[in-house]
From Swiss-Prot:
Gene Ontology cellular-component terms listed: cytosol
Keyword Nucleotide-binding in record: yes
Family of this protein: Belongs to the DNA mismatch repair MutS family.
Keywords: ATP-binding, DNA damage, DNA repair, DNA-binding, Nucleotide-binding
Key word Hydrolase present: no
Binding sites annotated in the UniProt record for ATP: G614, P615, N616, M617, G618, G619, K620, S621
Protein name: DNA mismatch repair protein MutS
Summary of the function given for this chain in its UniProt record: This protein is involved in the repair of mismatches in DNA. It is possible that it carries out the mismatch recognition step. This protein has a weak ATPase activity.
InterPro entries documented for this protein: DNA_mismatch_repair_MutS, DNA_mismatch_repair_MutS-lik_N, DNA_mismatch_repair_MutS/MSH, DNA_mismatch_repair_MutS_C, DNA_mismatch_repair_MutS_clamp, DNA_mismatch_repair_MutS_core, DNA_mismatch_repair_MutS_N, DNA_mismatch_repair_MutS_sf
Amino acid sequence: MSAIENFDAHTPMMQQYLRLKAQHPEILLFYRMGDFYELFYDDAKRASQLLDISLTKRGASAGEPIPMAGIPYHAVENYLAKLVNQGESVAICEQIGDPATSKGPVERKVVRIVTPGTISDEALLQERQDNLLAAIWQDSKGFGYATLDISSGRFRLSEPADRETMAAELQRTNPAELLYAEDFAEMSLIEGRRGLRRRPLWEFEIDTARQQLNLQFGTRDLVGFGVENAPRGLCAAGCLLQYAKDTQRTTLPHIRSITMEREQDSIIMDAATRRNLEITQNLAGGAENTLASVLDCTVTPMGSRMLKRWLHMPVRDTRVLLERQQTIGALQDFTAGLQPVLRQVGDLERILARLALRTARPRDLARMRHAFQQLPELRAQLETVDSAPVQALREKMGEFAELRDLLERAIIDTPPVLVRDGGVIASGYNEELDEWRALADGATDYLERLEVRERERTGLDTLKVGFNAVHGYYIQISRGQSHLAPINYMRRQTLKNAERYIIPELKEYEDKVLTSKGKALALEKQLYEELFDLLLPHLEALQQSASALAELDVLVNLAERAYTLNYTCPTFIDKPGIRITEGRHPVVEQVLNEPFIANPLNLSPQRRMLIITGPNMGGKSTYMRQTALIALMAYIGSYVPAQKVEIGPIDRIFTRVGAADDLASGRSTFMVEMTETANILHNATEYSLVLMDEIGRGTSTYDGLSLAWACAENLANKIKALTLFATHYFELTQLPEKMEDVANVHLDALEHGDTIAFMHSVQDGAASKSYGLAVAALAGVPKEVIKRARQKLRELESISPNAAATQVDGTQMSLLSVPEETSPAVEALENLDPDSLTPRQALEWIYRLKSLV
């Protein structure tokens, strides 16, 4: 806002505004004035641009016109949604005083702050995506990271050890709002993100954090949560919790615990891997043709969000995985009956969060009632399922018959949007409310009786009784008969063709009705708040029920997907390895218009690396990605697209597949590729699954081949990771001759004249040729260019007929033994005529040559 030099020069209302704005200088302030929220000064200018609304001026204050923009209060949610989507935060300032009794400006205060990471309103949230508030902290030992989903109460912290792991966490969680300390060093990690909030250092103090968290959970220490020895994570969590409390302006009873996320509990995937595998987002940034788009046929929003969390955090605990597999198997015959009932449950998780924040609307309570009404049917269907995990879920679900009965008695079948609209509480629930309503609702009968009586008394056939919001109740007589109005009729309003009157009896009744309506609405609001008080003691059990219902939705969905898409149950083995019979790519097989060619895969301690060759477009990348996706699906407990799968322990999945220039960071394609490769070579273990596609293609042939050879050698000999290594360097097909746990496979193709047929079938052994020219022809490269390329290829092959079979290893690499570039000093000496030099010139040349060496 513009600097205001003389505060006292402003009107009292603007002084009130400026005081409130000074408390929230960084964010937009919606200042309630009657039926509008107004914005002033710089806020008005920003809002007019962000929301595409008119920028006007309001009179003058301190001698200057005031820039102003406004939005109607009844449409505020739409405008808030637009601002939140742009990463903006808004302070909502309401009138809390009574205009009738106020001297000077009506009392106002900020009642809530809407920020991208703390929204819980249904209209502002993406229903099938988590909306996370996060905080990041860094010290000399690493990072601390905490996330909170305020719409469910899910509170997590972790301590990423290095920059790569931290980047992967940001990619996985994708927070809507991120808090960071004012001295945060790694700004390049978070630059460009929406919803960045710079916070003072003291908010990250460890002692303050412990105090805040213990106060929130009602505990003396944090040992029971397993986070006591995570100081960096606690620093982030403390700042995050304080921010959530500051913005919500209320208690947060649904946040009742915090969980530590440890690397060893889940399969680690870095940011590049999540991007390349297109788990929930494709490479173009959309949701189409992703793994989630195939697997997610859940029928509740909370189930959809849980499935996506599973996909981004595959678990390594085989006990949990076997339990999920057993449940999916047991539910396969019940999906048709369960899914229609589950669909009626809706988003109970987020409704409960709004209940906890006391912002639940009447329709939220109606939906909660509807969810409770489904529980008996769900429990009855699940009773016959022979599975201990299913029965455990059934118990967690509960019944809540008393709460269902309460809401059936208290809330009408189809309530209005807001409690202030009235008519929310059902008749029969409260005797006093029914009496006030009867008085208000009896107005129609009274007015009809009054109209009949007055017509008979006056003999005026145009007389009628009515009501409008401005003038209240009135008796109307046409202009032609108005001169006959009785003497006790007092004129209230003159119209073109009629006169309107009031009589003492009608005025008295009007006061009585308006009083009864006001009292009914006030009592209704009070009863509505009391409903929160009756429901909130059950919040913990209700949250457990919502979690169980979401998990049931996910497992029923995976059972349906397994049956519909012909998936099989994978087997977990103790030793590293992956054996797949007739494996398929879960996404590609759904979008193809022709049958998908299934392929086998065998990786074991004796066969740790496959060198994959074959033509471009032959299916190398698909084959590699399908292996990673099958492994990922197995480790969320899902069935997988194959005839049979045996899979050993996996700690990490890495992919180095494709690359593009990172223009924002000034990194070339090759630099991006090498950075990702370095991350793999530093962090992969013998239990990692590594996908390497076309390493070294971003530089010269010799450099690229050298790097590809050395990387393959390191992965096979030193790291011993389970590796799929696709390459166009045929020299690498000699690796199996030098290393016993490396094997060649290739994708088959048939060439006939200028055409090529991709068989998409994986065969043992190396590919016989590259088919590059045939693929170029298929892509539409002009025939004269293809013809010239064939001619050039024959020339090159005649010069080096055995290029593909050249020995390339650590001691002898004839293909790489290219002549070194001539030194500038040698070139200078060759061009020098010593006989023509004077002694002085000879001395100068010695110094010059010295500088060239």
